[in-house]
């Protein structure tokens, strides 16, 4: 699927859905976009229902970056190597690191109240889906 269409369709499909750990959180939103692009469900096999559960999975992988690298099976790269729809690691003040979706200039992140657009300079790195 076209990457821009994948991001737009995922945004529209889940725009009104509430945040839910393990169902529609920052990582699950990025996984839904990645599945539209690649046809692979990267969230398969990861079950959690709370922030504590999610933190446990992240900690057992020695951090969010390591977890995503393991799940995707590719190393992280700099922003200059990313395409629209690629998952990104974003530093958000007060909240810490989160996973978002690259839209070409910004990151789209599903937060508890809504999806937000985060300026590109907050993107630490990402994973090119190929």
Which residues does each PLM region occupy?
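...with weaker cross-activation on analogous glycine-rich loops/strands in unrelated enzymes
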Residues: 52-117
């Amino acid at each position: 699927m076209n990457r821009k269409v994948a991001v737009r369709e995922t945004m529209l499909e889940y725009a009104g859905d509430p945040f839910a750990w393990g169902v529609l959180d920052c990582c699950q939103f990025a996984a839904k976009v990645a599945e539209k692009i690649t046809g692979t469900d990267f969230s398969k096999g990861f079950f959690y229902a709370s922030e504590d559960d999610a933190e446990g999975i992240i900690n057992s992988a020695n951090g969010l970056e390591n977890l995503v690298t393991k799940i995707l099976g590719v190393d992280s790269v700099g922003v200059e190597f990313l395409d629209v729809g690629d998952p990104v690691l974003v530093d958000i003040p007060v909240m810490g690191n989160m996973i978002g979706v690259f839209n070409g200039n910004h990151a789209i992140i599903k937060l508890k109240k809504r999806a937000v657009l985060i300026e590109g300079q907050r993107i630490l790195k990402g994973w090119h889906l190929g």
